[in-house]
Amino acid sequence: LFFHDYKLNKNITFGLMTKAVYNLPDTRKRAVPRDEDDSLPSLLAEDGQVRDVTRRQSIDFESEISSTYTFDSGEWEIWGAYQYNESAKDHFEDSSENDPSLYYQGLSEGTDFKELSAEVGLTYSTIPAFVAKKFFAPMQIDALYNTRINGTNTSKASYVRVDAKVYF
């Protein structure tokens, strides 16, 4: 994880963030397709398609460039961010021995992704008022809007989120 804020002046901050996420391999029963046309493999044990399969995920990379403007009172902030995330295909293998009649590569389809997003947000904080002993608790409310600009194997959905934080 790398994160750094560059404070241009008392009101404007630029931020850079990048991180790599490694997921440990996991093994569980999975329905393995027989061939590339088998989009709904059988879940019945007697059909022989349910196997103990280990998934080895690729490393996920995330990065973000952002800018924040803090109003003079310190209570309000607005920000914008550009986000890029990418992950290569996961690899699947039978935990004992791959059955040659099954299509293990089919489990990897659609596990890779790339996404470009934009985010804008507004924050209200009582921290300056709390420090000045004018408010009873340090709290913060964030409202943000995130929209997907482009992507592969990812949702094209936009979302709105509101976070309420109380520090103690």
Regions of interest found by a model, annotated:
Residues K29-F168:
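Outer membrane beta-barrel transmembrane domains
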Residues L1-T27:
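Loop-centered beta-sheet repeat module
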